A protein has these predicted regions:
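Beta-strand segments within the central parallel beta-sheet cores of soluble alpha/beta enzyme folds
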Residues: 68, 246-252
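Conserved beta-alpha junction segments in alpha/beta enzyme cores
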Residues: 179-240
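Short coil/turn connectors at secondary-structure junctions
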Residues: 32-35, 59-63, 103, 110-113, ...
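Predominantly extracellular/luminal regions of secreted and cell-surface proteins
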Residues: 61, 65, 173-182
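Short glycine/threonine-rich loop-to-helix capping motif typified by GTGT followed
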Residues: 259-261
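Flexible, low-hydrophobicity surface segments
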Residues: 1-160
Length: 261
């Protein structure tokens, strides 16, 4: 029998999950594993003028407190854009790398300013309270028209007028010719600008990660709910300056993905 739109389909994967037999990242016991917490910038656009980590480092149960300065000192690489598209004029899009934490300027609210590694989550959260961060707020905008207006604050010097990509996937010449033919008949044409609202997927499970030393010295084992374990391994190997073969990514059940994982 051929199914049509709207007909129910028999799902084979649900019963195990409905019985509570799924295995998600939170179900994995890392043993005596440590916990990580992040201090995030409260401004949409600001300059980080001071960062004092010493009190947090002195807290009992804290193993590491680090900022982007520490990552730079350890030669941890930036995260690069994986997308490759061409602008309308045929030029390649300019790719800007992004540090894992704020390097002088944060460009969106929630950017990571510092990280804490501690015995448990409570200690890690307490250590965040001991970090003193000072900011110089900078002008920010919240819609696309304001972002490309004359005099708008520039997020990246590489992106003039805040335009990262001018991508066209249509036959502009053919479309214009069709409207011109319609105009010759005396019919009026109506123009409208359509701006898509920002859409953020929100799965029940966030994007947690468990990481630790692998079985062989110098290797890394990772558990995370991802729809792309190979790209995750490749990206992490690149920023950590490791051979990709030394990074093993294991994916348990994924608590909702929708493409963003």
């Amino acid at each position: 029998m051929k199914l049509k739109i709207g007909d129910p389909t028999l799902r084979l994967e649900d019963e195990r999950l409905l019985r509570g037999e799924g295995s998600f990242t939170d179900d994995i016991d890392p043993g005596d594993g440590l916990r990580v917490a992040f201090l995030r910038a409260p401004f949409a656009h600001a300059r980080l003028t001071a960062l004092d980590l010493e009190d947090a480092r002195a807290l009992v149960g804290v193993h590491l407190v680090a900022s982007q300065t520490d990552l730079d000192a350890d030669q941890v690489g930036d995260i690069t854009c994986a997308l490759s598209l061409q602008n309308e004029d045929g030029s390649d899009m300019v790719k800007v790398s992004k540090p894992a934490m704020v390097r002088e300027i944060n460009r969106s609210a929630g950017d990571i300013v510092a990280m804490v590694v501690a015995d448990n989550q409570q200690i890690a959260d307490d250590a965040l309270e001991l970090i003193e961060a000072r900011y110089e707020a900078m002008e920010a905008v919240s819609d696309v028209y304001a972002a490309i207006a004359d005099g708008a604050p520039q997020l990246y010097p590489e992106y003039e007028n805040n335009i990262a990509l001018n991508w066209v996937a249509a036959d502009h010449a053919g479309t214009s010719a069709a409207f011109a033919r319609v105009a010759e008949t005396g019919l009026e044409t109506v123009e409208v600008d359509v701006v898509n609202s920002r859409v953020i997927v929100n799965a029940l499970e966030t994007r947690p990660m468990i990481a630790g030393p692998g079985e062989r010295p110098g290797t890394l084992d990772i558990w995370c709910p991802t729809q792309g374990p190979v790209p995750i391994a490749q990206k992490l190997a690149a920023v950590l300056n490791m051979p990709v073969a030394d990074v093993r990514v294991r994916t348990p059940d994924v608590g909702g993905g929708f493409g963003y994982k």
